[in-house]
Amino acid sequence: MAEKRQAYSVPEAMKQLIGPGGQKWANMDPEERMLAAATAFTRICAGQGEGDSRREAQAGQYDPYSKASVTPGKRPALPMHLHFPHTASRVTSSTVSETSQKCRKPVMKRKVLRRKPDGEVLVTDESVISECESGTESDLGLWDLRHRFMNLQFQEGTESPVVTSQKFNLPCEYQGISQEDQLICYLQREEMDPPVYEQDLIVASRPKSFILPRLDQLSRNRGKIDRVARYFEYKRDWDSMRFPGEDHRKELRWSVRGQMLSRTEPPSKPQHVYVPNNYLVPLRWGVRCDLANGVMPKKLPFPLSPS
């Protein structure tokens, strides 16, 4: 359990920042002054409340989001070596690391946190580098690797780049590339753990990380595609996959149409011969006269009722 943070007042913080007689503040360069002032301000704010106590207790845990938040500032592109005789001791990595701590300053980066389907956290750096920052390294780990690589070359200064490439067991096509690329190829050949962050491999000749689009992200915009274009896409796929022996509909329709056009006209049907009907319908007055005179009506050509 994290112990309670000590409360810092403004006079105590200023006294600790300036030092006795102001000598500590006078011996600092502008970057160190800004860093010390920011640290004192953070301590004052943290002393007024216990909001950072929980964060301090969890500082020992691995937090990729916090690791990718701040990157060191400008540092030399290559580690600086002091050329002494072989009897003199060379500069160790700890001394160079202490020197780099003084040369760098915190710089905020634009980061993106994504979670993979398996639950793994992936933090990528999408910040834009200006031309003045293009020659700086982003991670201290890569800088230490470059330092060890340069120490190895300093120990074997008489060896040529071809011999160095053969020592790292690099293929022939990797012998003409830069030292940074040779180091990366060597780490990949030795199956060493790759850096967790893409900005760990950012060098002066390489751009910032580019995030490739995922397939599931592309499928989200499928509904925005033109429906007519999708219809022709499906139609093209359907036409490309045919069953063996299947007749194409278009060819079948055109063949039936040709058969219909090539036929002769059908023969005309025999027309019905109509017989004229000469029957005269008697009027009511004539029927009454015939009935009064006893004249029987003529025989009808058809029966009145069906038999």
Swiss-Prot record:
The keyword Cytoplasm applies. GO terms for cellular component: centriole; cilium; cytoplasm; nucleus. Expressed in hippocampus and dentate gyrus of 3-month adult brain. One of its GO terms (biological process) is cilium assembly. It is found in: Cytoplasm; Cell projection, Cilium; Cytoplasm, Cytoskeleton, Microtubule organizing center, Centrosome, Centriole. Keywords: Cell projection, Cilium biogenesis/degradation, Cytoplasm, Cytoskeleton. InterPro entries: Centriolar_ciliogenesis_assoc, HYLS1, HYLS1_C_dom. Residues 47-78 are annotated as: Disordered. The keyword Cytoplasm applies. Its main location: cytoplasm. Pfam families: HYLS1_C. Plays a role in ciliogenesis. PANTHER family: CENTRIOLAR AND CILIOGENESIS-ASSOCIATED PROTEIN HYLS1, HYDROLETHALUS SYNDROME PROTEIN 1. Belongs to the HYLS1 family. This is Centriolar and ciliogenesis-associated protein HYLS1. It comes from Mus musculus (Mouse). The gene is Hyls1.
